[in-house]
Amino acid sequence: MPAHKLLEIAEQLNIHEGVARARKQDVIFALLKVLTRHGEGVFADGVLEILPDGFGFLRAAEASYLAGPDDTYISPSQIRRFNLRTGDHLSGRIRFPKDGERYFALSIVDTINGEPLEASKNKILFENLTPLFPRKRFRLERADGSTEDITGRILDLMAPQGKGQRALIVSPPKAGKTMLMQQVATAITTNHPEVHLIVLLIDERPEEVTEMQRTVRGEVISSTFDEPAARHVQVAEMVIERAKRLIEHKKDVVILLDSITRLARAYNNVVPSSGKVLTGGVDANALHRPKRFFGAARNVEEGGSLTIIATALIDTGSKMDEVIYEEFKGTGNCELHLNRRIAEKRVYPAIDINRSGTRREDLLIESDLLQKIWILRKLLHPMDEIAAIEFVLDKMKNTKSNDEFFGSMKR
C-alpha cells in the first residue's frame, strides 16, 4: 500500500503522534498498535528469517525482506514445534507486545506456505531432492506479433529455456540486458501463470527497480547500489531460501538475477579473509556461496523446479569481473551472449547467436523442430554476429510465429 494511503488511514483513526514524515514501517507499526489495543483481530503474514539466536521474524517481500519495526516475532518454541526453516511463508493472528517487548508476536499459526499445518509436516528437504536435466520447456513466444515478442521467439529457437534451467546471460555494459530480462519476465508470466516468478536486483539503480516493479507481474526484490554489501547478501539468501521452500511444496519457481557478478562482489566484501587472494582481488573462499546460490537451480524428480536466469558482466574494465565470469562459465547449462557491437548499431536484442545455446536441447525440443533449428544454425554459422542477428530479425518481423518463420524459410 502506498505511504499516502497509510497516512489517510492513520488520520481516520486519530493517530497523529510520530506519524508525519515517518518511515512506512513505523506508520504500519502505529496502526497495528491501535488496532490490537482495541481488541481487533489482526492477522499478519510474511517470510520467516531465523536469526543465529534461534528466534525469527516475518519479513515482508514488499520491503525486500528489510528488517522493520512492523515485523512479527516468532519464538524458538514455535520454530521447533512446527519444524520451521528460513524462507517459510507463515500467516496467522498476532498479539500486542507485552511489557518489555518491542515487536508484535504471532500467537496462532494458521498456514505454512499457503497450506494447513498438517500438510507441511512430511515435506522432503530441498537438499535431499533428486536433480535432473530440464525436460519441460518454457514457451517464451507470445504470438502477438509485437517487437518485444521477437526476443522470446529467438530464445525459443537458439537458447530454449526449460523448467530447472541454470542460464547465464553474458553481457558487456549497455548491451540491453535489463530490457531482455524484462521481456523474459513478461513472457513467463503471460504464458506460464502457474510459475512463481522472483526478480532479484542486486546493486541496481533505484529507477530501474521502480521500472521493473511496474512492468513485471511477480515478486521484485531489490537491494540498490547505495546499500551495504551485507544487505545484498541477506536479500539473496532470503530469496534462495524462499525458493527452496516452494520447491519442497512441488512448485515451479523462476529467479531472474541481475547480476551474479555484483552478488559475487558483495560476498567478496562480506566473507572473512582467508589469506588466499586470486587475480583481481577475489578471495579464494568468496565464490563458494554465490556458486551455491546459482547451483540451486534444478529440475526435481519428485516434482517442482527452480530456474535461475542470471546476468554476468564482462568487458567492464575490471579484472575481478573477468575472474568471476570465468568461475561461473562452466556451471550453467545454458549461455546467452549479448554483443556490444550489435547494441551500438541499435539492433535489439543484441544476441550473438553463434555463441549462444543450451545443453541437452534435444530433451526440450521435438526432433522435427530440432532438425529445422540445426539447419538454421548451419546457415547462420558463416555469417558474422551482426549479419546473423539482422538476418533472423528481418525474417521474424515478416512473420507472427516461429512456425510461420520456418514456413517462410522453406520458400
From Swiss-Prot:
A Gene Ontology molecular function term of the record: ATP hydrolysis activity
Keywords from the UniProt entry: ATP-binding, Helicase, Hydrolase, Nucleotide-binding, RNA-binding, Transcription, Transcription regulation, Transcription termination
Name recorded for this polypeptide: Transcription termination factor Rho
CC terms in the record's Gene Ontology section: cytosol
Function field: Facilitates transcription termination by a mechanism that involves Rho binding to the nascent RNA, activation of Rho's RNA-dependent ATPase activity, and release of the mRNA from the DNA template.
Family annotation (SUPFAM superfamilies): Nucleic acid-binding proteins, P-loop containing nucleoside triphosphate hydrolases
SMART domains xrefs: AAA (SM00382), CSP (SM00357), Rho_N (SM00959)
EC number assigned by the record: 3.6.4.-
Pfam families membership: ATP-synt_ab, Rho_N, Rho_RNA_bind
Quaternary structure note: Homohexamer. The homohexamer assembles into an open ring structure.
PROSITE patterns tied to this protein: RHO_RNA_BD
CDD domains to which the protein is assigned, alphabetical: Rho_CSD, rho_factor_C
Family membership: Belongs to the Rho family.
Residue stretches making up the Rho RNA-BD domain: 41-116
NADP recorded as keyword: no
Alphabetical GO biological process terms: DNA-templated transcription termination
Residue numbers binding ATP: G162, K163, G164, Q165, R166, A167, K174, A175, G176, K177, T178, M179, R205
InterPro entries on file: AAA+_ATPase, ATPase_F1/V1/A1_a/bsu_nucl-bd, CSD, NA-bd_OB-fold, P-loop_NTPase, Rho-like_N, Rho_factor_ATP-bd, Rho_RNA-bd
Domain of life: Bacteria
